[in-house]
Amino acid sequence: MKFKPNQTRTYDREGFKKRAACLCFRSEQEDEVLLVSSSRYPDQWIVPGGGMEPEEEPGGAAVREVYEEAGVKGKLGRLLGIFENQDRKHRTYVYVLTVTEILEDWEDSVNIGRKREWFKVEDAIKVLQCHKPVHAEYLEKLKLGCSPTNGNSSVPSLPDNNALFVTAAPPSGVPSSIR
């Protein structure tokens, strides 16, 4: 399990751990997504992401996590949504990122032997549904109506550019969108 000695977990007002992640695409067509091996279960694939640090903005946290876990840099695009995992008490800000640079060696490849691999979106959904269904939801949401603009124009499915709030379990008095 990955735990850094200087790591500080941050929580929102309702006690959910604040997380950020990116769906990293090879191009703006958003047809191939990068997944990384899990630190806990190296034979399983996940979307790169992790906890936000104190005073860190969600977009900055997402870019940092992708750099550490996947060894890529890119152009940060739109906020796809804020996904809630009731079981683990996580709220994850999920962004779209178009990869512009791929590092040969990166922090998690060197320290824990993490791997990365490109998947067609449909294949990634199938792989993620087995052990990380919440991560599969990110890609399913993407397919349901977010055009591949990567933040270059307004997203029709999100009025006024508000983030869609998605729950992994029935909502418990949480608003359907967060402004």
Swiss-Prot record:
Its cofactor is Mg(2+); Mn(2+). It is found in: Cytoplasm. Residues 17-143 form the Nudix hydrolase domain. Its EC number is 3.6.1.52, 3.6.1.61. Mg(2+) 1 binds at residues 49, 69. Keywords: Cytoplasm, Hydrolase, Magnesium, Manganese, Metal-binding, RNA-binding. One of its GO terms (molecular function) is snoRNA binding. This is Diphosphoinositol polyphosphate phosphohydrolase 2. The lineage of its organism: Eukaryota, Metazoa, Chordata, Craniata, Vertebrata. The gene is Nudt4.
